Amino acid sequence: MKTFSPTPENINREWFVVDASDLVLGRLATQITHRLRGKHKPEFAPHMDNGDFIVVVNCEKIKVTGNKLADKKYYRHSGYVGGLHEITLEKLLASHPERVLMNAVRGMLPKNRLGRAMLKKLKVYAGPEHPHAAQNPQPLAIKY
C-alpha cells in the first residue's frame, strides 16, 4: 500500500455561501479557516492549498461577545514616524464590516504565501447580495 500524496490535478474545490447574520465572529472564523485550508477533506496536505471557496454575506450583522465592540482595537502603521493608527471594532464594523472577518480569518491562516493564497478564496460582502451566483455556491451550515 502506498501513501497517497495529492497533486494539483486531484484538487476538487467547491463553492459555499455562509450567512453571517447573528453568528459570533471568532466561532465563524474558525469554521471558515478550517474549510479554506481544506482540513475537512481526507486528502488534506499541509503543503498544498486544497481548500474550498467561501462566500460570506451579511457580514454587517455579525455578533461579538462581551465588551469587545468598545474594547477591541485594530492597529496599523503607515511606516512613518508617529504613523500608528488604531480603530475600535465598533467603528470598523460601521465603516468596513467585511474587514473584521477578513482580519479574524487572516490571523488563523499560515503566515506565508500559502496562507495568502488561501485568503484569496474568501469573498466577504457586507450585504445579502454577492456576484458569485454563476459558481452555484451551496449553503454551508455553521455548527455553532
From Swiss-Prot:
An example Gene Ontology molecular-function term: mRNA binding
Keyword Ribosomal protein: yes
One cellular component term from this protein's GO annotations in UniProt: cytosolic large ribosomal subunit
Biological process according to GO: negative regulation of translation; translation
Top-level taxon in the UniProt lineage: Bacteria
InterPro entries the UniProt entry points to: Ribosomal_uL13 (IPR005822), Ribosomal_uL13_bac-type (IPR005823), Ribosomal_uL13_CS (IPR023563), Ribosomal_uL13_sf (IPR036899)
Protein keywords: Ribonucleoprotein, Ribosomal protein
CDD domains documented for this protein: Ribosomal_L13
Signal peptide: none
Chain coiled-coil ranges: none
Quaternary structure, from the entry: Part of the 50S ribosomal subunit.
HAMAP family the UniProt entry points to: Ribosomal_uL13
Family the entry assigns: Belongs to the universal ribosomal protein uL13 family.
Function description: This protein is one of the early assembly proteins of the 50S ribosomal subunit, although it is not seen to bind rRNA by itself. It is important during the early stages of 50S assembly.
Name of the protein: Large ribosomal subunit protein uL13
Organism: Nitratidesulfovibrio vulgaris (strain DSM 19637 / Miyazaki F) (Desulfovibrio vulgaris)
